[in-house]
Amino acid sequence: MTPKTTDERVRFGVIGLNHEHIYGMVRMLQTAGAELVSFYAPEPELAAPFAERFPAARQTTTQAEILEDPTIHLITSAAIPDERAALGIAALQHDKDFLSDKPGFTTLDQLAEARRVQADTGKFYAVFYSERFENAATVRAGELVKAGAIGRPLQTIGLGPHRLRPTTRSNWFFDAPRFGGIINDIAAHQMDQFLFFTGSQHAEIVAAQVGNLAHPQWPGFEDFGDVLLRGDGGTGYLRVDWFTPDGLGSWGDTRLTVIGTEGYIEVRKNIDIAGRPGANHLFLVDGHETRVIDSAQIELPFGRLFLADIVARTETAMTQAHSFLASELALRAQATAQRIGSEWS
């Protein structure tokens, strides 16, 4: 269902609370003006804190109640990753747009079916690449690159280290088929940023590798992955891992470097180690100087643009092709990755 006029408020439901990203997604949609109507989660321990945080939302006893509600325009989800595609496809088939936490898929077959249904229905299947959409320094970096601040972009380097915190994780977290592997799970962010900053419309995986280098107690887990890729707008390298030490004052020292013909930009998203306090650190080096750029007042426009797209059926927040391609690259890199580490034990 699509809002009938631009004045009609976008109404959305939530199905699946298995990752805490859902709280940020809901907050983003509400801040942009959408109304949370209802939610469903089969796990009482997940439903209770969500209901307390969003008391105006009605808790349903089945997900079908949300899918079949004709007043709901959008469904958003942070379900277990291998369950997201089936839910998203069902949402589209019920005439609703869908916003998924990343990863939006765990297999290439799921992606192919989602593409088919999306083409048939014309509804949005969007993946929420929060490292770009919800990070002010990265948004500002995009504005600078678009304005030509570093010339023509040549390469992105994306680093996505994370802290493991194993006692806070559910069993599915350590089972690669359930989350699609480390490249598919985490590096979907870096694939999105590679496409966005280089302007690539097509890309290929040059090399990829994954491994469980230090956690033999979870044989189905992967704690390291990296990828080299090439697009029609530039090249990219990315590394993701679960080795952030407890001594760091953040869950991960995630970084983005964009190299251009006339300079480069580095974004230290969460922390500037032993440097400036806080997050959202943006550095620009060009032919004249080195600058630290303040991004504190930068608007995060994704929510506003996405809701406008739902109403107008435009693609200003992110194109459908981009959403799918970033996921496809992560899936293809995961599927073709060489497994490493056993020779080091």
Regions found by a protein language model. Give the residues of each.
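N-terminal Rossmann-like dinucleotide-binding module
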Residues: 1-54
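C-terminal helix-rich "cap/oligomerization" subdomain common to oxidoreductases
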Residues: 1-9, 14, 74-76, 305-345
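Contiguous beta-strand/loop segments that form the cofactor/metal-binding neighborhood of enzyme cores
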Residues: 2, 192-272, 303-309
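C-terminal glycine/acidic-rich active-site capping loop/insertion
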Residues: 13, 247-248, 253-321, 342-345
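Beta-loop-alpha module in the N-terminal Rossmann-like domain of NAD(P)-dependent dehydrogenases
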Residues: 43, 54-117
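A contiguous active-site-proximal alpha/beta segment in oxidoreductase catalytic domains
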Residues: 82, 105-167
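Mid-domain beta-loop-alpha active-site segment that forms a flexible
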Residues: 128-136, 167-203, 220-223, 322-323
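Oxidoreductase and adenylate-handling cofactor-binding alpha/beta cores
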Residues: 134-157, 184-213, 226-235, 336
